[in-house]
Amino acid sequence: MEPLLSFKGVTKGFDDVTILNKMDLEIESGHFYTLLGPSGCGKTTILKLIAGFEQPDDGDIIYLNKSIGELPANKRKVNTVFQDYALFPHLNVYDNIAFGLKLKKHSKKDIDKKVIDALKLVKLSGYEQRNINEMSGGQKQRVAIARAIVNEPEILLLDESLSALDLKLRTEMQYELRELQKRLGITFIFVTHDQEEALALSDYIFVMKDGKIQQFGTPTDIYDEPVNRFVADFIGESNIVEGKMVEDFVVNIYGQDFECVDAGIPSGKNVEVVIRPEDISLIEADKGLFKATVDSMLFRGVHYEICCIDRKGYEWVIQTTKKAEVGSEVGLYFDPEAIHIMVPGETEEEFDKRIESYEEFDNA
């Protein structure tokens, strides 16, 4: 299948600073994509290039097999929902949503139908005459989305559009955005620095750092199989320790061999071992894989977050529903499936090839 949109060696800079350097990416139709990364990583620049607000310095942007690198923003089948919503405060809900349709000289009958349909989709039926200044943050968010989808775009861009909402409302809007994307069936491209938001919303995630894509994949793939230390740390909490590969499916940590599910790495290769906090159990000290001392405990609502210090001085973070006494000695236990092996310096292509090789081994 041909991608809906692709970047081919796109380079973009501002004030002699390169933001994107020969970037390649592909977007297929009908999925929810997220550009995830810290501030300054280039994710909003990608959005501006797709929208037509900026043009690439080099490379090309392809939409349905046609170059759009020089195509003006108003000629693209793309609409954007901005972080501040960019609504007109002097216009009511109806006129805000109808604004673009009026510019395009649609008939009043057509505009009425499209506005009413859009309001129904965002669950604001009956709000046509409401003043924008009388609306809550969540309602303004919905109006901004309605104004975008009324133009029937092929791609909807959302630039950190939930960041101004409080936690409860942001969570509610995550459900609504996901449901809306499925109902519309169009491509959503969402920008955020919030990893939990990205995991909850996305079909696919681009994890970015310093203008480069570190890893692309489904939320599950990226969470369970991070390609490097940055991704492992950025996507949720991680315990990362140094180890050495013994052979396929065996890794040595602290001079002790552990079964794992990774293969395709040379024997004796120095590696980094990732174990998620929720995959570690606290048990009696003598029954654990190794011992540690409880250093602190915080109650996080759905679980306790417990920090333990092992004999090497490394701090382990454990998420569990069971309490532990600060200062007590405990045993740490995890299953082979909880261990993920990262090879320092391994590219995403090399990582994917390695994963595929031992998945084929498992299926043989």
UniProtKB/Swiss-Prot annotation:
Known EC number: 7.6.2.11
Catalyzed chemical reaction(s): ATP + H2O + polyamine-[polyamine-binding protein]Side 1 = ADP + phosphate + polyamineSide 2 + [polyamine-binding protein]Side 1
GO MF term (any one): ATP binding
Pfam assignment, any one: TOBE_2
Residues involved in ATP binding: G37, P38, S39, G40, C41, G42, K43, T44
Localization of this protein: Cell membrane
The keyword DNA-binding belongs to this UniProt entry's keyword annotation: no
Highest rank taxon of the organism: Bacteria
Location of the ABC transporter domain: 5-235
Membrane topology recorded in Swiss-Prot or TrEMBL: Peripheral membrane protein
SMART domains per UniProt: AAA
GO cellular component terms, semicolon-separated: ATP-binding cassette (ABC) transporter complex
PROSITE patterns the UniProt entry points to: ABC_TRANSPORTER_1 (PS00211), ABC_TRANSPORTER_2 (PS50893), POTA (PS51305)
UniProt function note: Part of the ABC transporter complex PotABCD involved in spermidine/putrescine import. Responsible for energy coupling to the transport system.
Family the entry assigns: Belongs to the ABC transporter superfamily. Spermidine/putrescine importer (TC 3.A.1.11.1) family.
Subunit structure: The complex is composed of two ATP-binding proteins (PotA), two transmembrane proteins (PotB and PotC) and a solute-binding protein (PotD).
Name the UniProt record assigns to this protein: Spermidine/putrescine import ATP-binding protein PotA
Gene this chain is encoded by: potA
